[in-house]
Amino acid sequence: MALSPSSDAILSIRSSCDRCRSQKLKCIVIETPSGTACCQRCARAMVPCIFGRRSRSKRTTTTTTTTTTDSGRKQRRREPAAALNVLDSCAAPELAASSSSTNAHFPRGINGGMGIPEDRENQETGTFPFYAGCYGGSAPVTSAVEVIQGRKDPDRNLFRYAFQEESTIGDLGLFTHDMSLFGQTLDDASLANTEVMPPSLTESDGISSPGESAPFRVHLPLSEPGVAARVLLSFASDLHERLETLQNGPWQQEESSMGLDGYPIGSVLHLSLTLTDLGVALQKARSNDDASVSASSHKMDDGQTERVNPNSTQAGGISTSTTTEPPCYDTSVSLMLLSCYVTLLRVCTVVLGNFQTYLHLQPRARPKASPASIYPSSASCLGDLLPINQPHHRIHAAVCLLLDSLEQVEEALSLPYQVRCASAVQASSDPGSCTPSEAKPFSDAPAGAAGRDSATTLIHWGFQTSAAGMQDASSELRQKVEGVKEMLRQQMGL
């Protein structure tokens, strides 16, 4: 084999580098600023220029040394070349040179070492990083596979939740996207945007990562066993992560002087909207399931099966049926909905507590408006006047939004009127509305409300089994709302 090619020399296909020889091209060798030889094509492509016709993994390279004996005869002796010391992908390959004749057979690589790869697969998978020596640099730019493919290695995390770590719902960046959380990996038929699912499910279930929010499909089999439970468990996990984030945040510390302009109120409202849409979607799935079961039961003989009566309740209001299809709204789903609602109450309580902490740190003096803000110009109108204390107005708006979102959740879950916390707080602030004590008991409600379906009955049963925890969460939230509103009245001079 020829010696190292001189600068600006055109090599034959046999003596060209591995990359050019695989494409049946002739190398045009140039001299780099570092003094090494490099092919023009490899230099432009920013890939290692490797000269060597044989793969070390398939055939051992041997060298031939010629010695002259005393009798004048030349003896040829074949010696195996030194083994190639291949380091990991973070370091350049190094060779232990066995003889000077071996180094003369192959041109030196870009990095100054021998350019013989261990095998062709290592060259294609980026074992040897590209060094910027041909452009005057010395630090590695990137690996060859990244240069060829034009991108980094794919993310191997199944969830990509950056909520979850960027994959957990604790990340605030998630809430800057669309509010719906289902991906577009299902069929092409689209659904209503008002129905969303939590983001923590894997793509194996046909659900995309949480970072990519999109409307989910209404034909998702929520009535199948286990689907609704997995969705609610995922959402419950996101609720607890958000609760932990708010509890450990800087706003929880009384000595902190941090303002509330960057408070993540949108994440809490997003959770309320998600739970509302989940309740609506599950009720629709339940009604569709009841309609299909009722239609099939009418076609069957009365001696083989009993007709399904959704208004008939036995053993505490739980409807019974002899059909083989299990109801979508079973006891576990109802209790998980109840658990999500209670956790959402705790999240809202923490938010209101942070508002209270901030208001405690504010001065008690009544704010006074400057003359410039009172009389901006002679043609000013009432709508042109700026609020005296904008942070207090923002807090009041946030409290109203939280109560409205909780009221929507309670309506979507069809909760009994006695345990609707947000509705009770709203009614107490409105003298003309009905108070919680005037609401009819759940068992005495009209037939349309009492016998909607077994889902409402099961939720009510879940409330009865966990009444103590519900009362604590509801009373704490009510106290926080009243405390924040009272402090706002004092600070704003109302």
UniProtKB/Swiss-Prot annotation:
Keywords (A to Z) from UniProt: DNA-binding, Metal-binding, Nucleus, Transcription, Transcription regulation, Zinc
What stretch or stretches form a coiled coil here? none
Record's Gene Ontology CC terms?
A: nucleus
Q: Does the keyword Coiled coil apply?
A: no
Query: Where along the sequence lies the DNA-binding region?
Result: 17-49
Ranges annotated as biased composition (Polar residues):
306-323
Q: Where is this chain compositionally biased, Low complexity type?
A: 60-69
Region ranges (Disordered): 57-79, 287-323, 429-449
Q: What domain of life does the native source organism fall in?
A: Eukaryota
Subcellular compartments: Nucleus
Among its keywords, does the record have DNA-binding? yes
What's an example of a GO molecular-function annotation for this chain?
zinc ion binding
The entry's function note states: Transcription factor that regulates the expression of the gene cluster that mediates the biosynthesis of pyrrolocin.
Q: What is this protein called?
A: Pyrrolocin cluster transcription factor fsdR
* The organism of origin for this protein: Fungal sp. (strain NRRL 50135)
**Record lineage:** Eukaryota, Fungi
Q: Tell me what gene encodes this.
A: prlF
